[in-house]
Amino acid sequence: MVKEMNGNALNVEHDINIHLENKKVSRHFFVFLFLMYAIVYMTKNCFSGALADIVADGVLTKSQTGLITALFYLAYTPLQIVGGIVADKHSPEFLIKVGLFGSAVANAIIFFNHNYYVMLVVWTLNAMIQFALWPGTYKIITSQLCRSDKSFMIFFISIASTLGLLMSYVVAAILPSWEMNFAVSAAALFILTVIMHVYDKHLNRFMIRDYEPISINSGKSTYGGSTFSLFMKSGFFLLLIPVVIRCLVGQGSKTLAPLMLHEIFKTDPSFGNLLNVLIILAGLCGTLLVKLVLYPRIVKNELLGLIICGSILLGFTVAFVFAPTMPLTVVSLCGIALFSTAASLFISYFNASFAKYGKNGTAAGISNAAASFGIVLLNYGILKISEIWGWDYVRYLWLALSALLIICAVGVFFINKGFKKSEKQN
């Protein structure tokens, strides 16, 4: 591979099938992408982070706040599939800038206008403008940055979402009012847009063009079928059920904990947010457990790792159901957060395996769509269940879902094993 001549200089805002081989430049850009996605994830959770304060102040009801977040992910979910396909065909850097700028505008509007219906519409539009932000980020990491660093970059970018979620609750606890969450988010996103644009110009001279696009029929892979067939036969589509469940249970343990503790044990909302920091940090430990201990030293198969983490997750969910006191409830929620996050990283490693077919962006988009659908169910369905029947029903539902996650993960393991065997034979 050679750099383009000056007359045909590469432009990351237009060219695809390009990559960096300069490790220093690649790693610096990744650090920016890591911080960027952490902040983006923080801004996506503005309503969740301030949920207890918004409800306590009487600004919105629990159902109204849940509906705003649910509609965000209801719009976000199908568009992630579109975003994944688009990120495989167009510049992911340009798509990221569109998402950053649009989200900054949405956060600024909500800071100045607290009308419920305005919030509902603007936050839904915010979801739509971010349609390719995550698929674009994942595409850059798994295809454009230095490929020898790919495993570590997938590991660290999974930490970014945990860090972003943690920041959303820390910021909510520190700021004097819930409205300031949106002011801080808007300012941060505007700054990120500018930095991303400057970085794009800087990267052009370091980019190298691939010899040819990596596609299903390029000879890079022995599989010659359609994308749908690839995802079906590899077990990817069945894996989407554990993805949804992981969000319902794992994400629920992080985002609903302050409200749950407030309503069950009458804890102060601010104290609940601080306790939630422990739960989110436990989730971060799950990521570290996978990368530093389990994979690939002890567990060499991503799907086997998912089964192991799902089994331990089920044990902590049982403890959560029968926990009689607040300390035991918090400990069980920490365990749920830890092993659900570990399971999520194994899923990310599995999705990265589709890079050899040129479908890693599509896989990331579809997987993120499934996760977003889980968050829709979490923020409206689970909140509605807690409002009508109470938190005990939520506990038993999470227990049943944790068991279903293991069943589906085992199914995917055997389907994928057969798929790999047939690939080798062909």
Regions found by a protein language model. Name each.
Residues K300-F346:
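C-terminal transmembrane helical hairpin of 12-TM major facilitator-type secondary transporters
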Residues V122-A160:
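Cytoplasmic helix-loop-helix junction between adjacent transmembrane helices
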Residues F47-S48, S234-T287:
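Extracytoplasmic gate region of multi-pass secondary transporters
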